[in-house]
A protein has these predicted regions:
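Structured-RNA-binding interfaces characteristic of tRNA pseudouridine synthases
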Residues: 10-209
Length: 209
C-alpha cells in the first residue's frame, strides 16, 4: 500500500515481567515511554543522515538538550515515512541531571512533552530494568490499515486513509486473510539472507471490517 498515511502502528505487546523492577546502570536510568505521533510530515521513525525529520531524531535532540549528553532512543519498531503511531514503545538511558539527581519517569515525560511539537506526544513513562530493550523484548505488534472506498475522502480524515475510490469485496478479503494467518518463514522478504536470527513469525488472523 503506497499511501503510508493509511497505515498506523496501534500497539506493541511485551512479555509479562519484561518491565519489572527498576534498576540503575552506569549508562543512567533506563526509562520506557509510550508515545503517539502523526507521521505526516516525518520521514519515518529511524534517524537518517540525509534528513532531520524523523521521530527518533527529534526525540534524541530533545533528550540531549535535557541532559547535555547524547542519548540514544531504542524503538520497538520502525514506521515508514508518513506512517502514524497510536502507541509506539521506546526506551532510553538518562544520565543524572545537572544536580546529580536521577530522572523520574514523570519528569522525563513532562520535559519531553514540553519541547516536542504538537504532532508527537509521550503518553506514558516508566522505570524498567537495565536490560530491558523495546525492540528485543517486543513479542507482538498491531497495525491498522484504513481504506476509503469513496472517490473523495472526508476532508478531516484524508491524511489517515488510503483513497481507493471503488468498492471492496470484504468477503473475498476475509477468505484470503485465512491463508495469511499462522506461522510462516519470511526469509524471502528479508534483506539479510544469511542471518542467525529467526525469520519465522506468527501472523494473527487479520480483521476485515
Amino acid at each position: 500500500m503506497r499511501n503510508a498515511a493509511a497505515a498506523g502502528l496501534l500497539a506493541d505487546g511485551f512479555k509479562e515481567g519484561a518491565a519489572g523492577r527498576f534498576e540503575e546502570t552506569v549508562r543512567g536510568t533506563n526509562i520506557k515511554i509510550v508515545l503517539q505521533y502523526d507521521g505526516t510530515r516525518y520521514d519515518g521513525w529511524q534517524k537518517q543522515g540525509n534528513t532531520d525529520r524523523t521521530i527518533q531524531g527529534r526525540l534524541e535532540r530533545i533528550l540531549e538538550r535535557m541532559t547535555g549528553q547524547p542519548v540514544e532512543v531504542y524503538g520497538s519498531g520502525r514506521t515508514d515515512a508518513g506512517v502514524h503511531a497510536l502507541r509506539q514503545t521506546a526506551n532510553f538511558y538518562l544520565p543524572p541531571d545537572s544536580q546529580g539527581k536521577e530522572w523520574t519517569p514523570e519528569a522525563a515525560r513532562d520535559a519531553l512533552n514540553r519541547y516536542l511539537p504538537e504532532d508527537i506526544a509521550v503518553l506514558e513513562a516508566d522505570h524498567v530494568p537495565e536490560r530491558f530493550h523495546s525492540r528485543l523484548h517486543a513479542v507482538s505488534k498491531t497495525y491498522l490499515y484504513r481504506i476509503e472506498t469513496a472517490k473523495r475522502a472526508d476532508v478531516f480524515q484524508r491524511k489517515y486513509v488510503y483513497i481507493l475510490g471503488r468498492t471492496l469485496d470484504a468477503d473475498a478479503m476475509e477468505r484470503a486473510a485465512l491463508f495469511l494467518a499462522g506461522r510462516h518463514d519470511f526469509r524471502g522478504f528479508s534483506s539479510l539472507k544469511r542471518t542467525r536470527k529467526s525469520t519465522v513469525r506468527t501472523l494473527d488472523l487479520p480483521e476485515i471490517r
